[in-house]
Amino acid sequence: MFLAQEIIRKKRDGHPLTEEEIRFFINGVRDNTVSEGQIAALAMTIYFHDMTMPERVALTLAMRDSGTVLNWKSLNLNGPIVDKHSTGGVGDVTSLMLGPMVAACGGYVPMISGRGLGHTGGTLDKLEAIPGFDIFPDDEKFRDIIRHVGVAIIGQTNSLAPADKRFYATRDITATVDSIPLITASILGKKLAEGLDALVMDVKVGSGAFMPTYQKSEELAESIVQVANGAGCQTTALLTDMNEVLASSAGNAVEVREAVQFLTGEYRNPRLFEVTMALCVEMLVSGRLADSRQQARQKLQDVLDNGKAAEVFARMVAAQNGPTDFVENYNKYLPTAVLSKPVFAEKAGFVTEMDTRALGMSVVTLGGGRRKATDAIDYSVGLSEIAALGTEINTDTPLAMIHANSEKSWQEAAAEVRKAMVIGETKRETSPMVYRQVSE
């Protein structure tokens, strides 16, 4: 039998905690036998003293085991259970293509996603722009969709990693969110509860990233890869660029529109294509659905070219109570904003810099994102046709198309977009999309 305060004292004095001590504390978080003050104290000691790799693995597994861990054995699936997690960014709509692409190649993707907060968009919000789309199917329905379609994207239920929810809420109000061991356990506790065989982690770098520097992003990627593999899940990570909006659009309905166009081949933003492909390749290789990256890439290109990936997406939407003809008629179903008009730069030149975070916040200004978790959002608003870095701009070339619900919010967002996009004299070199791959 342990005492929470003795566990806090031990960590405060710089000693590593045992697996039993960590489990006792996390179970207490779940059962409400550990107080909010004690959670705050332990979080702060971890923030200052860090955690060894065995401690991080133990914390992650304790978070995972605080609730239900999905088990797919009874379904006798003929492929691996694989998923992707992104640290979030702006215009990061990869999940909507990646899930169907990997499923079309024989993987099973039970993706449990989140909502948007602040400048980062949320996959669930994007999907809820589709009329009728149900992000909370019951357990039987969820398993049924995975068995028959191969991919489902749903919201986190209270039964998955419940200790994390309480632990995170305390971190949020005690300035202990940005601790690498705590971020690692929070992300992986939820992801590993999906019962995965393999995971790929997309860690963003740059002005729209969650981590402030390349070094911090790299540190997080390395921590996640080591801890997830230590917990028995084949995991790699990619460090990808978020110095500009990833897709050509940012918002909810506008990003779903772009995802459908990507899957059908109507329009594929080259940067979005590169990142999505790179992540899918990792998933196929880690899940042993391909012998090499080259073979994986070919398989993925094939399911895009022959329409299988688009078909899987259509079946997922229908299975989750969306329209059965959504892919063919997405424009009919997706909400459109009252006002759509372009914003222009005040001078000619090249787009040399982009404050991606500020562009994400302009979507919040329009009503398409949240400042706090309880905010309602307008699915129709956002930005589209965003000029990429290096684009030559004159006073007739728009920086972006702004979709707003009033002239006032259009004007506010236009000012933010102009400020966020720097126009310079010379064309800058574009940065790579994938900086490096992190594996064990």
From Swiss-Prot:
Pfam families given in the database record: Glycos_trans_3N, Glycos_transf_3, PYNP_C
Catalytic reactions on record: thymidine + phosphate = 2-deoxy-alpha-D-ribose 1-phosphate + thymine
A Gene Ontology term for the protein's cellular component: cytosol
One Gene Ontology MF term: 1,4-alpha-oligoglucan phosphorylase activity
Pathway: Pyrimidine metabolism; dTMP biosynthesis via salvage pathway; dTMP from thymine: step 1/2
Protein keywords: Glycosyltransferase, Transferase
Keyword Cell membrane: no
E.C. numbers: 2.4.2.4
Signal peptide feature range: none
Keyword presence, Glycoprotein: no
Transmembrane segments: none
A biological process term (GO) from this entry: thymidine metabolic process
Superkingdom in the source lineage: Bacteria
Assembly notes: Homodimer.
Similarity comment text for this entry: Belongs to the thymidine/pyrimidine-nucleoside phosphorylase family.
Primary role: The enzymes which catalyze the reversible phosphorolysis of pyrimidine nucleosides are involved in the degradation of these compounds and in their utilization as carbon and energy sources, or in the rescue of pyrimidine bases for nucleotide synthesis.
Identification of the protein by name: Thymidine phosphorylase
UniProt organism field: Proteus mirabilis (strain HI4320)
